Amino acid sequence: MAHATGVGARVRRKEDDRLLRGRGRFVGDIALVGMKELAFVRSPMAHAAITGIEIPVEHRGAVFTWADLAAAGVKPIRAVSGLPGFKVSEQPALADGKVRFVGEPVAVCVAATRAEAEDIAASVFVDYAELPVNSDMLEAVKPGAPRVHDHWPDNVFLETNVGGNIAEIAATAPVKVSRTIRTARQCMVPLEGKGVVAHWDRHVEQIVLTTSTQMPHIVRAGLSECLGIDQGLIRVVAPDVGGGFGWKGLLQPEEVVAAWLARTLDQPVRWTEDRREHLTAAANCREHHYEITAYADERGRLLGIEADAWVDAGAYSVYPFSACLEAAQVGSILPGPYDFAHYRCRTFSVCTNKPPIVPYRGVARTGVCFAMEQMIDAVADAVGREPWQVRLENLVPPEKMPFDNVTKKHFDSGDYPESVRRAVAAIELEGWRARQKAGEADGRLIGIGFATYCEQSAHGTAVYHGWGIPMVPGHEQAQARITPDGGLELRVGVQSHGQSMETTFAQVAHEVLGIPLEKIKLVHGDTGLTPYSTGTWGSRSMVMAGGAVATACKTLAERLRKIGAHLMQAGPDDARLEEGCVRVGAAAVSIREIAHTWYRAPQLLPADVDRGGLEVTAGYKPGSDHGTFSYATHAVAVAVDAELGAVEILDYVVVEDAGTMVNPMVVDGQIYGGVAQGIGTALYERMPYDAEGQPLASTFMDYLIPGFTEVPHVRIIHMLTPSPYTEFGVKGIGEGGAIAPPAALCNAINDALKPLGVTITNSPMTPERILAAIAEQQAEQQAGKRGAA
């Protein structure tokens, strides 16, 4: 059944009218009678023992420490992994005798206003005894390094090994290229910071936590574990949320504290994260280090990849994903869509005196793509071929689909080489090569870069179990209910914070039932009203929850068809559901009439009517436990000023395949936003720490993010290869735009700097880094000349 506003239609977002008119309801908009504000005393040191906490007499009763929470039976946050050898770190919601990163909460202060709470926090004196600091993950893994957790034998959460012995290939391969590659630590900087309002609902005897989160049910589970109470005594509500990107996809200490205070004080409390807290005290992301070697033949055909990878996971393991998700992903996804036979990868999740690392948009894929795509260009340079040609040499061809790569990742569908060919054509490579050869009048250097990535989404239970996640997803549920006036109410456990679910899920339901979009209402983000879900993350929502919506609506459609046929005195096999009506020949009865019969005139129903009525709860799991793979090739042309180190993006093309697009306009929006964040990763964003573990970027004067003038016009070209395993053939696309830009831009910058003999392998590619690399190369050349003389 095809509809003008169903699957595949460019429908304007239903959410926009409310949000653009300022009618959204965020945590900051909530005002409860008697609500108190919270401020946290945070550690100014990266590693220290707490030898004393002095609270002014006049503020006793307004300041709470871990001793208060522990006395009430509150337990630390405990994020474990199912992978053998994982070391568990327990994170108390307020520091217990020791702090392990700058910004770790030590005490919480309660007052009528945030300003008063901050004044109280400033009056609390904490006595610290400094301890040695681990601020560099490569130093932290060395023998004798000071331990972040005293009872551990070292500073490694987990070491993993994937693949086998490739010594023979290493010894015989005609081409061997090696690189040291590093990605910077980042913050996630959503438009809205984290916020929490907690109160005790005396009527139902529940803690109600309204929080800007991506996963209400998982936060409820974590609170239950920490507070030692049944999940039925906790309700978690996610109101409108101003972006998440992973930062709002975990249980945070402040949520535990707020929930406990609300019950203990029997008063509503609120904590609102300010920007300085986010930059200096919040979870970080992305910091990877690779030692990687590619082996190839004379044409650039990959024979094998060998890599060691380190991920700086910070001081604690985050709930629910654990500290090892990112590194565990690296080992299994590094080969990507490339078809080669020999592989070995060893990874280390390293514990340091920094905030914990959190899965950020793209998770490990951004770092993996940055490393792997540099190696493809390095191989191309070694064999004297165009980088796009070497990609074609190595990408899995469409005739091999479905395809299992060297780490047994099961690729469901796609034509990866075609995405490269279309990107080459769209960027007009020959024209750029001619311009590059002729040179620019202003002396800038032209470079063209490519990057191809794949994005696995809607993974099943086996995949997540293999990564050690204790909270194993694999299915999703949705409720669909025909209202008495013939409308439709959908309830899903995933939470929408920019994914356009109010629109796209309505399109899915409309495709099945034909009910107009304006009569479809979505309820989400509330554990008290929706079915269980592991939340919105990993580009899973449309495949999983959208599949559940479709499944529930199909069951409803069958019930509607049977009742409608009975009302027209026809057999069910003679009836069809079209455009919101059940039809038998030329006769028709509307869904509104059927709903009226069910709710108001049940005496007219058939005797064997399904007693479930016009309300369905359905579960959904894709046809393959491996999920789906969307993919894209990004192509970019840049101009690099070798005197200033400045990079200008001249053209940017994305050729992507998201399978069947429920709403192409929404897909475009996700790609635009992802590319903007990827440009930030590539050129601007870095959270530096000094040797003492002090964060060196506490404002947006120091932590740079791209604005409108830094983000170019992005040209998007859609391919369409439906997944054989999902409803309508959809694939996940939410994170993909952020994965490839760092790799594509790095390759373009290196292409521009090639005449100077300069190669950049670390992100971000800032002017300072580019100028330093040029100066280093010039110094080496001068030293070589002096040596020759």
Where on the chain are the PLM-derived regions?
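Active-site-adjacent "gating/activation" loops or surface patches in catalytic cores
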Residues: 212-214, 458-486
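Short Pro/Gly-enriched beta-strand edge/turn motifs at strand-loop
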Residues: 78-81, 172-186, 271-278, 322-323, ...
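Short glycine-rich loop/turn motifs
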Residues: 96, 192-197, 289, 447, ...
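Glycine-rich loop/linker segments at domain edges
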Residues: 9, 15-17, 80-89, 154-196, ...
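Flexible, low-hydrophobicity surface segments
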Residues: 1-153, 264
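Thiamine diphosphate
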Residues: 240, 244-266, 270-272, 501-508
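C-terminal catalytic domains of large/alpha subunits in multi-subunit enzymes
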Residues: 67-68, 228-233, 263-269, 298, ...
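Extended active-site and interfacial segments that coordinate phosphate-rich ligands
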Residues: 17-18, 125-129, 214-216, 221, ...
